[in-house]
Curated annotation (Swiss-Prot):
This is Phosphate import ATP-binding protein PstB. The keyword ATP-binding applies. It is found in: Cell membrane. It comes from Methanosarcina acetivorans (strain ATCC 35395 / DSM 2834 / JCM 12185 / C2A). InterPro entries: AAA+_ATPase, ABC_transporter-like_ATP-bd, ABC_transporter-like_CS, P-loop_NTPase, PstB-like.
């Protein structure tokens, strides 16, 4: 049973009756959700509950998995992203993704950021401005402006994760998916990423998967609780954490299981 927010202000992503199977195993069951524009939506739940599988449906990353089958509808700005003829490369430009562990390319800081724009045909003379914009947006410019030609692998873990965020921003997405972006970081780096996420929602719609419920409470406007492939409850974060409608939501948030 799902308590979902209906008719939210400016839904940018609408998911209707989404089901997903890996071979014979069903991993997502009848998920419906509206994700508002220019907001942070956190997805919480125990390991293996379907959170990461769900966000990979939003940019069709699950297409890369053998024997993965999807039914249902996922719309972004009223466009069904699973319709025939959808340009998946363009979709993944619109819907960027930041992964659990920082994954900088083995090249310079500059080339890490310029890589995506080059692929998408950016003019060479514009690349410098794009790189600066992305690094400033990811709060990394002041720490890297004097060493753009240095290898990205020389950055600290927290800096590498902000570099990955900058790399995503460089191709001008509309939506950014974060899959446990702070799980490999220390508390100071985590705090910087959280502050960055809250700043980015002015210009982007953000969906974050996290096992850290305190993080979900700090950064998100909306929260969805997943359990065994089902969306149990979805609503404004304050309501989910202070007055959940489902007993299993309350049990998870209060640490009775997880």
């Amino acid at each position: 049973m799902t308590e979902a927010v209906q008719n939210v202000a400016q839904p940018q992503i609408e998911v209707e009756n989404l089901n997903l199977w890996y071979g014979e195993k069903q991993a997502l069951k009848n998920i419906s959700m509206q994700i508002p524009k220019n907001s942070v939506t956190a997805l919480i739940g125990p390991s293996g509950c379907g959170k990461s599988t769900f966000i990979r449906c939003l940019n069709r990353m699950n297409d890369l998995i053998k024997n993965c089958r999807i039914e249902g509808k996922v719309s972004i700005e009223d466009e069904d992203i699973y319709e025939k003829g959808v340009d998946v490369v363009e979709l993944r430009k619109r819907v960027g993704m930041v992964f659990q562990k920082p994954n900088p390319f083995p090249m310079s800081i500059y080339d890490n950021i310029a890589y995506g724009p080059r692929i998408h045909g950016a003019n060479k003379k514009d690349l410098g401005g794009i790189v600066e914009f992305a690094l400033r947006s990811a709060a990394l410019w002041n720490e890297t402006s004097d060493r753009l030609k240095s290898t990205a692998l020389s950055l600290s873990g927290g800096q590498q994760q902000r570099l990955c965020i900058a790399r995503t921003l460089a191709v001008k997405p509309e939506i950014i998916l974060f899959d446990e972006p702070c799980s490999a970081l220390d508390p100071i780096s985590t705090s910087r990423i959280e502050e960055l996420i809250m700043n980015l929602k002015k210009d982007y719609t953000i969906v974050i998967v996290t096992h850290n419920m305190q993080q979900a409470a700090r950064v998100s406007d909306y929260t969805g609780f997943f359990l065994m492939g089902e969306l149990i409850e979805f609503g404004k974060t304050r309501q989910i954490f202070h007055n959940p409608k489902e007993q299993s939501t309350e049990d998870y948030i209060t640490g009775r299981f997880g």
